[in-house]
């Protein structure tokens, strides 16, 4: 209460910041006359002078900001016939300061970005503009390139599916690069799997503007980017677990209010935390069905894991809500955008469990080769900024995790949209009927309606109901997302009815004409509250752009997921007190507040989850940075591994001595020299004469073995020149490093999966994870030292004579195989084994095998 009064008297921090920016806007406006009087060539010349001054460090970016913004505004007027409003200049300054600009729908965020983009591209270190999809990346780059090209700046676009390294390199070397968050992240991971510096496509991470920043840095923060490879593990367990899961019966959790109450059934589902707990009865039943004595024995660990995932697949994941089945494949539906996430798969065997559930071909389990979260990728940039229409609800998270401040930019024209209170019905069916009646009422007078649904399944239900009512409409969901921009752009036409899942065409404007304005503008109907208030605000924000009229309202029921899981007891009590009959609804601020409190509960759960993921990923991130930094050193053409190999060889020999129980301080006569010679030969291919090293003390023995390995190695390397030696050492070392890092990531995945159980032992799982992961990393370092020396010692070079011999042997083998083919006489109608493509009877079968042809 006191805080609210203080804000009214003194103004908020946001208000103070906006006032500061408005003072600078006046200075930029004062320059408008100066630049509008210049010819095109004079304007370009002025910009070039500023760029030269900046590159020669005579001025800073802040010194020239006013002039650059004024020039960009003038160029935009001349090329695009669009003039930046004052509030757009403020948005540009907020982005330039490394903050988040919250700008409502239709305020021209794409044009705002051109201001800081041009200013930060002037130092030639590159600027990245990140969008949520390929369509927006291509559209924004194409539209705004007229401004950039006028000023002599180059523009590149990174699109998914176009993996030509040379083209990508050109795009990244442009002054300005547009692309999606996934492509930027994956290119970073791919670059750190390359074997030459010249093969890398990205350059330094300088300045980035993230469009729809809330979607990318918050909604997708729980989804790491993973490059994976096959594990070659058997897939039978998934089918077996699926059969067992179908026979287990779902029960109810124990009631904490009733003493000694127990969970019923074979397993209990906790929808709030999206987890499943198998009861004692369920464990006994599963053991019987699997035919094992103890499901939780070490040898059955994979079985119990498969069963957990199968139960999740059947009880927590719904077809057409969380995933769709298309072309015999299970494809994830992004819960925030409603789009299909093709190419993305659930990890830890969950995707395979869904494939078993749906009876489609189970694809091989994958192993992580490289991974990173968006949180850690975007924190690599020297300066990170973002823009969106909805960020204030997550301002705390932006501040805590990304050190980003959210500044709300005033609208150019006041918002005229009317947001009505929610209507709540007892059942989902009543709600559906009420929505259809409301659509009919609006449709009769011609007011366009956009209906937002939470899933593909619900959008299909509305589609069928509207078909029954003979109301013409368009459907936009993940199944027909190809026409997204086209469908959304038409949603503001008179009489239009559009059903859309959460995707609702972000970045595409819904324009309305004067006739629709007279009818009250676009009517937004939300059919379910999302877990995040921000997603609801985005749906509302589709109407009322640039001062247009509009209307929005949410229709809810007590059977909606959010209210059922998180908040319906209080609301149900209110409805019972008011004696609400079937088909009736309630509309009150009290209920709307209760719904918002339920959403806040979920948001804080998700925030904790993202924070938790980041805390764990920060541990892995430090290790990732260390490995990638070392990898970059290896790729440096001037880096010589000679000293590193000498040092690693010493550690390698110490490891071999430890293996055969030869320790410092032991008596030379008691050392098992025969075993040592055997191990050295097995691990390095180097033969040592026992008599040469018998009776030596520990240090003399170690030196002798090291010298022998070094002599062998130098002798082998003497057949090639120094440059070739360096290249071979680097390539082999990189291969060993990548293999060791892959194995390390696999071990880290296993560690992360089970670490939560340490909490039952009164230990902090995060502290335990840090300790264990440090130990794993030290194992990685030791493995790298030993494996690299082992590989370098064992490798052998072929002379030209060896190559010729191999080729001759190969040829003889092929001829022998062919002879064998002919000895097993084929049937007359079978294809002829000579490879002609004809039947045997029409070819070699005519007059016996024509051996002369193959001599």
UniProtKB/Swiss-Prot annotation:
Part of the Sec protein translocase complex. Interacts with the SecYEG preprotein conducting channel. Has a central role in coupling the hydrolysis of ATP to the transfer of proteins into and across the cell membrane, serving as an ATP-driven molecular motor driving the stepwise translocation of polypeptide chains across the membrane. Its main location: membrane. NCBIfam families: PRK09200.1, PRK12904.1, secA. InterPro entries: Helicase_ATP-bd, Helicase_C-like, P-loop_NTPase, SEC_C_motif, SecA, SecA_DEAD, SecA_motor_DEAD, SecA_preprotein_X-link_dom. PANTHER family: CHLOROPLAST PROTEIN-TRANSPORTING ATPASE, SECA INNER MEMBRANE COMPONENT OF SEC PROTEIN SECRETION SYSTEM. It catalyses: ATP + H2O + cellular proteinSide 1 = ADP + phosphate + cellular proteinSide 2. It holds the Pfam family SecA_DEAD. CDD domains: DEXDc_SecA, SF2_C_secA. The gene is secA. GO terms for molecular function: ATP binding; metal ion binding; protein-exporting ATPase activity. Zn(2+) binds at residues 832, 834, 843-844. Keywords: ATP-binding, Cell inner membrane, Cell membrane, Cytoplasm, Membrane, Metal-binding, Nucleotide-binding, Protein transport, Translocase, Translocation, Transport, Zinc. Belongs to the SecA family. This is Protein translocase subunit SecA. It comes from Campylobacter fetus subsp. fetus (strain 82-40).
